[in-house]
């Protein structure tokens, strides 16, 4: 049955001063729960157009829009929280994109303020100044709705103050919670420990243990960073990992091993990629028991699966098969050592890949799940995990979007870890000279072009929000040292020589301000 209806058009009005680009050439839609779904949405300078939502009645549109003096960033239009519906088949409805973005942000800020007030927080004069400016400009934009150009200009200004207000609301509320709560001595501030092999080990331990109380050790079957863990099936190379494990233990660092199953393109050997589903089940059972058993109770947690919400899927399994593999691995890990936590790690928090229909570089063969839908499927199928994990590399979203997404994990009733977070410190002479990270000609993404202090700002603000939430137990920065970081120039150290970036010092001062150091 056809689900095609009429055209809903979001017409952009380019009031920006600069050359752009001002609107990304693709967009996506989300349902009322903010889960991305596949639709026929398209985006161009002529407009964002959608006419087939595959039966989803109410939806938002997610566009990357250049909001000068804030950033070229993804922003939601959700009709002020009421969401959109398609016009009847054969019909057409046109909306002013600028106005819809502004309206949606104004109404969100109202909801967030009221929500936070119930906990005793009172917004400051500074916060309310931004809120009032955005509200007044929104009222002006409403009065000029018949004049699209004028309405768009006022809406853009409204959105600017509204976005700044959103971030200030969340940060101020977080600081309020921190000020009234007890020091969280059990809060984990962590990082991956691969730096042990990327720089002088003694220097690594000096700088790492001064900063972190939590570390992850990776067990990729094949890896470009250091010795492969399982290049040949069954030939497990523990020795390299055991060295750093033992050193971290000597320094009283809590350790997580990761991952037991991650079928991503760069770490999946052909012998695994070519296994049938039944063969994978047998392998997962044996592998999990052997790896978890090797460390006994020495690990705090094992990451059971990574990015398995139909994103990392070189083994090309169905959603049901992935759920079953996850369940089996959790059962075996618990049976092997019930005292060790079982963590599920998710990437791509906003699930743009659902619209792009991609498993990494592969075209997706089956319907895909967002991280939240994947986690709900695990709960519904009785999968016995104990920690919910979400990566949060700078997501081309503002801080308000980040915390609202993370709040969705509360319903699963497990502690939440921000398993991998990171942002760039921007290009430097070395990255420009070797071409690994050059100066961009596009509008900046967030506040200004990335530099060391902006990286430190984002780190400080994200960690502040996370620390204020009792249900978030850890934040893990990825990675420690450049040029080996996943995010280009995303390390806390400039090079293996150990030069500290502003973000390294900022994180240390932040912990001191909380009484953790």
PLM feature segments, named:
Residues 210, 214-231, 239-350, 428:
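Substrate-binding cleft and catalytic face of glycoside hydrolase catalytic domains
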Residues 134, 215, 248, 291, ...:
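Conserved, mostly hydrophobic/aromatic
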Residues 192-196, 220, 260-262, 304-307, ...:
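Active-site beta-loop-alpha junctions enriched in small/polar residues
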Residues 195-209, 281-292, 364-379, 401-402, ...:
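Short, acidic/polar
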Residues 2-34, 70-135:
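Amphipathic, heptad-repeat alpha-helical segments
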Residues 172-223:
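An acidic-aromatic substrate-binding cleft motif
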Residues 273, 294, 303, 308-328, ...:
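Aromatic-rich peripheral "rim/lid" segments of glycoside hydrolase catalytic domains that contact
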